[in-house]
A protein has these predicted regions:
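Primarily recognizes the serine-hydrolase "nucleophile elbow" in alpha/beta-hydrolase
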Residues: 1-58
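Short, solvent-exposed loop/turn and secondary-structure capping segments
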Residues: 11-15, 26, 51-56, 75-80, ...
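Hydrophobic/aromatic beta-strand patches that form the interior of the parallel beta-sheet core
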Residues: 41, 65-67, 98-100, 192, ...
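Active-site-adjacent alpha-helix of alpha/beta-hydrolase-fold enzymes
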Residues: 57-136
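Alpha/beta-hydrolase-fold serine-hydrolase catalytic core, especially in secreted/extracellular enzymes
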Residues: 103-108, 113-264, 270-275, 281, ...
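Extracellular ligand-binding interfaces
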Residues: 243-272, 276-389, 405-426
Length: 427
């Protein structure tokens, strides 16, 4: 099933209703569908315009692909991310879910009818259409991903799976744009998803313990859309302060997860195992402790319209020249052997990408913040750590550590940490 906008939400609801025996809002209405629905594609979908039995639409054991454009002036928040999170894999079959977030895509150009005017006439004249991809380019993204998704899910062609795991595999096939993708399959074994309780030292995996040191920010919280509405997804925010040269030795900031048991999909860690997590730049500023009151005063003045214009320009220039955040991943085996690699070795942290939907100077009252944190899935093969550190035995892995000793200070959002079978699983 494929749906666009409200049709994207409807496709997911149909996927749920297909397996129900009665209508959730009136049990007197019986269902007898049982179609062979194996895959759902949602293009810039809405979410929870209809809530079966007053609840968000649940979905399980089905393949799911969702698209969203960062310049969608109609569904301006990534509502499909909520359905993505709600989809669970509970049986023994192979399933996967994937999402693709494209910076210069709007709402309407994924089809040939709605076009580049997400508001319609006459108000559409104030939309920032200069930022958009050409309509054919935007539909090329859809053609490539949808055809590959159908080949994979309906024809069982596993050779297309890599493009859902990492958009860079087919970068030459896609229009010039910024892409962020997520991927999770039914081999994924979750260690931390931050949904289980309010204790920041416990993990989703029984017996696992979380610790942190020298962190300027460490909190578990609900992730928000640009509009401040809930994504219904708890994550952890981690921040570190100061220059990289100051973050060494006893001042080293890190976030650590220690496992008391082996959660590997195959029963034990191997060279083929992938360490998986989702991450995004939070775009949060860390004030120095003694400057917190001063910074708050500045924010208050800005809200009152009294900010110094020169200072504002300097801040905008600084924001524009920001380098992507950097960190390293350290794995520690049961015997204490360590293997540490930069995340850039696998994929850099995406820079903050801000959207301007209209030509008017203040659009925040309609759209909220210019930046909406969108998670990117990272896949780190344990084999790469083994290659760099021959003494490291992936089979004895017990500690995963996120180490913040590189680059500038900043705050990241982290979620869905775990392990998955290798990339050749379906090939």
């Amino acid at each position: 099933l494929i749906g666009h906008s409200r049709g994207g939400e409807a496709a997911a609801i149909a996927g749920n209703f297909n397996r129900l025996s009665r209508y959730p809002d009136d049990a007197g209405v019986t269902f007898d569908f049982d179609f062979s629905i194996k895959a759902i594609i949602a293009i810039a979908p809405s979410d929870q315009q209809y809530r079966p039995a007053g609840q968000p639409n649940p979905l399980e054991n089905i393949n799911y692909l969702v698209f969203q454009g960062a310049h969608d002036a109609d569904v301006s928040i990534f509502m499909g991310a909520r359905q993505y999170e709600r989809l669970k894999f509970t049986d023994n079959n192979y399933w996967f879910k994937a999402s693709l977030y494209t910076y210069r895509s709007n709402h309407g150009q994924f089809n040939t009818v709605w076009g580049d005017n997400d508001w319609g006439k006459p108000m559409g004249i104030i939309l920032n259409r200069k930022a958009l991809l050409d309509g054919e380019e935007q539909r090329t993204i859809g053609k490539v991903y949808i055809s590959a998704f159908l080949e994979t899910t309906l024809h069982g062609n596993g050779s297309y799976l890599p493009l859902f795991r990492d958009y860079r595999v087919i970068r030459d096939w896609l229009p010039d744009d910024i892409y962020i993708n997520r991927f999770e399959d039914s081999t994924f074994k979750r260690i931390c998803d931050f949904e289980e309780d309010v204790d920041v030292t416990t993990a989703t995996l029984a017996g696992a313990e979380i610790s942190g040191k020298n962190l300027a920010v460490w909190r578990e919280a609900d992730l928000k859309f640009r509009s401040s509405r809930t994504k219904e997804n708890n994550v952890v925010f981690l921040g570190w302060r100061g220059a990289a040269s100051e973050r060494q030795g006893d001042n080293l900031p890190y976030y650590s997860i220690e496992m008391s048991e082996n959660p590997s999909p195959g029963g034990e860690f191997s060279h083929d195992t992938l360490l998986i997590f989702s991450l995004a730049d939070a775009d949060e500023k860390i004030p120095e402790p003694e400057e917190e009151e001063i910074e708050q005063d500045k924010r208050d003045k800005k809200k009152a319209g009294k900010a110094d214009k020169k200072e504002k320009k300097e801040e905008e220039k600084e924001e524009k020249n920001k380098k992507p955040l950097q960190l390293r991943i350290e794995l520690i085996s049961e015997d204490g052997t360590k293997a540490k690699l930069s995340l850039d070795r696998f994929m850099p942290v995406h820079p903050v990408i801000k959207s301007r939907f209209t030509k008017i100077s203040n659009e925040s009252s309609r759209y909220g913040k210019a930046y909406e944190p969108t998670m990117q899935t990272y896949e780190l093969p344990l084999a790469v750590f083994k290659e760099e550190y021959p003494a490291f035995d992936p089979g004895q892995l017990r500690v995963i550590r996120f180490v913040f000793d590189l680059g500038r200070e900043g705050v990241i959002i982290l979620d869905n940490i775990g392990f998955s079978a290798g990339r050749d699983f379906l090939r």
